[in-house]
């Protein structure tokens, strides 16, 4: 990985296309060194990391920058990590993409509230122009690119930003996740240009000579019970009433719950979804408020109808998804995963951590538990979303 003196010592013939790393040390000096050691064999063009909020973030920034030198580094805080060992908490994980098989452009977006389609057009156009000058793929570059977003998970601006980017990207797929803060819901941050930022987003455009597939799935099945959103707090992702009754009380009623039982775990095990066309999209609840309103992780409008959902088997469904991805791509060298915090709550509740970790290890996943997932122009909840990257095309550089 990293400084040029080390990079030039790596033989291109044997340098891997990708590398993965993780550390459970909360000492930023130790953690950064362990990340560096695991990624050093990859002649990296970029490094992406996800970390818990227990780290002293300023010191972690300095340590990572010291090891990475002029390599592009982006990242964010998380609500749980998927490391080379599997599901973890209070840790850091990372992956590196090699300059032999990847070319990347990164950008920090700070003006989330005013970010427009014009801004997105200018940003994407400039990034594509730069990538064309150093493409690693054959043929039209747009057919060998994907976009990746990391967004402040408390900004309430994900929909605006990803919709603008998606329109500008046209046929280039876009995937990403909303940063977490270990479920404190106080301060989520993204990392770019050597430091952490709040109220911001990071966008990375990736050109690759490797096969890849962008995906997004959920494992939930509909039940009969419905809730109509009858009153909201505009622009706040807060539902005040279902069926003209206090939202929390109606939610409890259809799920057979008591008000005092409501928690993140309960919300994870009793999700709701909105139907758009033939598809059901989950609308996850973040928390119950003192006035009996409910705060959601996604935008939600008055008049929509929500359906009660139940798990159809998280482990079995994830295994099916990963097996199908592997059948289409062959061996997966890296799976960049954005795994909703409510999936993690279900994993913990049902004691699935080791079995899910085994699945993630077998498919070379690096990722984090998010406050929301993005796929193309959609901001989602309760999904397993990401990019599966296969082996390089041997006929290409």
PLM segments and residue spans:
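Hydrophobic alpha/beta core scaffold segments
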Residues: 2-397
């Amino acid at each position: 990985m990293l400084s040029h003196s080390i990079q030039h010592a790596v033989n291109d013939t044997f340098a891997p296309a990708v590398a993965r790393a993780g550390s459970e040390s909360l000492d930023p000096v130790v953690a950064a060194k362990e990340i560096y050691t695991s990624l050093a064999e990859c002649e990296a063009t970029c490094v992406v990391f996800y970390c818990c909020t227990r780290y002293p973030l300023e010191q972690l920034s300095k340590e990572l920058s010291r090891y990475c030198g002029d390599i592009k580094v982006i990242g964010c805080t998380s609500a749980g990590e998927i490391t080379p060992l599997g599901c973890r908490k209070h840790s850091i994980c990372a992956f590196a993409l090699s300059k032999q098989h990847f070319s990347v452009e990164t950008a920090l977006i700070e003006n989330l509230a005013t970010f427009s389609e014009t801004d997105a057009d200018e940003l994407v156009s400039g990034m594509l122009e730069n990538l064309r000058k150093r493409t690693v793929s054959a043929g039209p570059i747009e057919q060998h690119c994907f976009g990746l977003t990391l967004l402040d998970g408390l900004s309430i601006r994900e929909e605006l930003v990803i919709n603008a980017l998606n329109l500008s990207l046209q046929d280039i797929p876009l995937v990403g996740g909303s940063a977490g803060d270990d479920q404190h819901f106080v301060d989520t941050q993204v990392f770019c240009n050597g430091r952490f930022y709040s109220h911001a987003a990071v966008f990375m455009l990736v050109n690759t000579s490797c096969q890849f597939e962008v995906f997004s799935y959920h494992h939930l099945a509909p039940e009969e019970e419905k809730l109509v959103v009858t009153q909201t707090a505009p622009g706040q992702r807060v539902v005040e009433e279902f069926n003209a009754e206090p939202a929390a009380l109606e939610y409890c009623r259809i799920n057979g719950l008591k008000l005092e039982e409501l928690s993140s775990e309960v919300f994870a095990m009793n999700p709701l979804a909105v139907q758009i066309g033939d598809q059901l999209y989950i609308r996850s609840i973040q928390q119950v408020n003192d006035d009996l309103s409910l705060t959601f992780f996604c935008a939600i409008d008055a008049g929509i109808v929500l359906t009660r959902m139940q798990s159809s088997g998280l482990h079995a469904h994830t295994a099916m998804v990963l097996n199908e991805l592997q059948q289409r791509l062959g061996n997966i060298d890296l799976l960049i995963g954005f795994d909703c915090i409510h999936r993690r709550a279900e994993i913990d509740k049902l004691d699935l951590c080791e079995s899910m970790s085994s699945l993630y290890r077998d498919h070379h996943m690096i990722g984090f538990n998010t406050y929301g997932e993005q796929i193309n122009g959609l901001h989602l909840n309760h999904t397993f979303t990401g990019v599966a990257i296969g082996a390089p095309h041997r006929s290409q550089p």
